[in-house]
Amino acid sequence: MPAKPYAPSHIGSVASTYTSMRIAGAVKDSLVDLVCEELDRLVPLMEVATLDNDAERKTLDDAQRTRLNYNRTRELMIDRIKHVESVGSAAVQGGIEHLEKFLGRLMRHCEEAASRDRVSTIKPRHLEIALHSMGKG
């Protein structure tokens, strides 16, 4: 049995974060079809890229980037919650995006510090400088 498509209201809610205009119901219906068509195009490409990277792999992966592990991030978030009972998938995805941006920003600062020293290896002193410049050290 194939998966149910997205609900137009859900797609409309997500799409509304990219515009300040209202979205007509018929447009929301069309967006569901368009998103599913984009998945029809995307998934086979991702399958090929996944198997090109690892022919034995059984799970679809994003070969274009390495992401923080979803389950590990979720578990770490659950360990830290105090006022709610669980962590939803949107929160995990948002957390991963936030952490990856943080890591990217931190690495850029580390690179700058290493470049000033005219070295090609990020060392602990460069991390300290980066953290200090970000107000975290």
Task: Please describe what each predicted stretch is.
Residues 1-137:
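Intrinsically disordered, low-complexity terminal regions
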